[in-house]
Amino acid sequence: MKKSTLALMMMGFVASTATQAAEVYNKNANKLDVYGKIKAMHYFSDYDSKDGDQTYVRFGIKGETQINEDLTGYGRWESEFSGNKTESDSSQQKTRLAFAGVKLKNYGSFDYGRNLGALYDVEAWTDMFPEFGGDSSAQTDNFMTKRASGLATYRNTDFFGLVDGLDLTLQYQGKNEGREAKKQNGDGVGTSLSYDFGGTDFAVSAAYTSSDRTNDQNLLARAQGSKAEAWATGLKYDANNIYLATMYSETRKMTPISGGFANKAQNFEAVAQYQFDFGLRPSLGYVLSKGKDIEGVGSEDLVNYIDVGLTYYFNKNMNAFVDYKINQLKSDNKLGINDDDIVALGMTYQF
């Protein structure tokens, strides 16, 4: 059966939301695109801090300038504005991404600023649920696991033009202190490598990061040590309207918990989705993070839930969704982590 035009658009939309940018300027070798979304959403849960309105607006700008036939300059900024806070609340806006750099043809790109950490190159493959997901080891401002500040990033696609589908990332993160201890980091390095076997439907990836820990982090009750390390590996299949992905990672003295960090955390994520030709996309996933060697606790699940979701795409710009997070944590877990289910219901307009 032939794929419909709608199904093809939706598969591209799901694969990379950033490609939905609208070009607003393209003249004299300078280009400017804008993109964003309005997510009108409500959480239903017995957990009071999660129950209620979760509406937000996300807006971004991508710019590019052709310096010469080989060298291109670029920049990107992305911010999020809460729609569930009062107008006088100064915490309603946050910067997600802010970086600038240069790209030299087959030799790769280099940029600096607030960006995605190298470990997220693997974790992104399973961060595909309609609302939840991607939270076993990836957390914002947690070393190089997700979005973070002070990142110098080198990326090379197709390995200098020699191997189709072999992509390399090298990253350095400068220390960030003077903030909440769990959001701090010392100097660190990271790398990732992915390969799609020359343009096939299958892909594999791996990543590793190592960072110095700060003095403030070592003053916390749990997980003392000079280094925070992580590694991850992933598999992905994306073809014939089917999306399958799985990820396994381990962190050392990096994953934040009550009273500090877990000395070790083992993390697993999996997702399966199917895009129907008429716009419906069901999703089934599982996320697990198990803390090990925790002072006064031993082993304990940090994250453990089944996710069942459903998205209906009216077109490439508008969708409605429901996402059910079925919490599998024990109510008497020793770290006092919430064990309530959450249902997210909403609509998204994206451009």
From Swiss-Prot:
Q: Which UniProt keywords apply?
A: Cell outer membrane, Ion transport, Membrane, Porin, Signal, Stress response, Transmembrane, Transmembrane beta strand, Transport
Where it sits in the cell: the answer is: Cell outer membrane
Q: Where would you say this protein principally sits, based on its record?
A: membrane
Biological process terms from the Gene Ontology for this record are: monoatomic ion transmembrane transport
The record's InterPro entries line, in alphabetical order, gives: Gram-neg_bact_OMP, Gram_neg_porin_domain, Porin_dom_sf, Porin_gammaproteobac, Porin_Gram-ve, Porin_Gram-ve_CS
What membrane topology was assigned to this protein in its record? Answer: Multi-pass membrane protein
Name the Gene Ontology molecular function terms of this record.
Answer: porin activity
Expression induction per the record is:
By phosphate starvation.
Signal peptide coordinates:
1-21
What PROSITE patterns does the entry give? Answer: GRAM_NEG_PORIN
Q: Which family does it belong to?
A: Belongs to the Gram-negative porin family.
Q: What does this protein do?
A: Uptake of inorganic phosphate, phosphorylated compounds, and some other negatively charged solutes.
- Put simply, this protein is called Outer membrane porin PhoE
Tell me the classification of the organism that encodes this protein.
Bacteria, Pseudomonadati, Pseudomonadota, Gammaproteobacteria, Enterobacterales
Question: In the UniProt record, what gene is named as encoding this protein?
Answer: phoE
